[in-house]
């Protein structure tokens, strides 16, 4: 059984609220879980104390048992100091226009001037 520490959506339509749960990776997102270990309320301001709440002892227990956090939960755990922060991956840069497109742009600029 592969355990994940992940978000389970709760709350009303257009008012998201997430429970941070320990669940089997094969179970549905909002389905059966083993234990609730925190909560995440994205509607609160990012500096609000209750935006992310974690039960530190239980999370460290499940991490020692081999549970793997999802990407978003790994960021929460990294910010709380419970796990190493995930590596920041830079977004790829948009490639420069090819030679022919640059020539067309230069010709259009010259025609406009």
UniProtKB/Swiss-Prot annotation:
Organism listed in the record: Gluconacetobacter diazotrophicus (strain ATCC 49037 / DSM 5601 / CCUG 37298 / CIP 103539 / LMG 7603 / PAl5)
SUPFAM superfamilies, alphabetized: Ribosomal protein S16
Lineage: Bacteria, Pseudomonadati, Pseudomonadota, Alphaproteobacteria, Acetobacterales
Protein name according to UniProt: Small ribosomal subunit protein bS16
Gene Ontology cellular-component terms listed: cytoplasm; small ribosomal subunit
InterPro entries per record: Ribosomal_bS16, Ribosomal_bS16_CS, Ribosomal_bS16_dom_sf
Keyword Ribonucleoprotein (UniProt): yes
Keywords per UniProt: Ribonucleoprotein, Ribosomal protein
Disordered: annotated span: 84-113
Keyword field contains Ribonucleoprotein: yes
Encoding gene, per UniProt annotation: rpsP
Superkingdom as given in the UniProt entry: Bacteria
Record-level Gene Ontology MF annotations: structural constituent of ribosome
Family: Belongs to the bacterial ribosomal protein bS16 family.
């Amino acid at each position: 059984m592969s355990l994940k520490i992940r978000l389970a959506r709760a709350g009303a339509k257009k008012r998201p609220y997430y429970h941070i749960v320990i669940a089997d990776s094969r179970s549905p997102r909002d389905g059966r879980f083993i234990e609730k270990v925190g909560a995440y309320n994205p509607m609160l301001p990012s500096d609000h104390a209750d935006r992310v709440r974690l039960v530190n002892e239980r999370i460290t227990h499940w991490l020692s048992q081999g549970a793997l956090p999802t990407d978003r939960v790994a960021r929460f755990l990294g910010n709380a100091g419970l796990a190493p922060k995930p590596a920041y991956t830079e977004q790829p840069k948009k490639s420069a226009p090819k030679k022919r497109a640059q020539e067309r742009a230069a010709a259009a600029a010259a025609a406009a001037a």
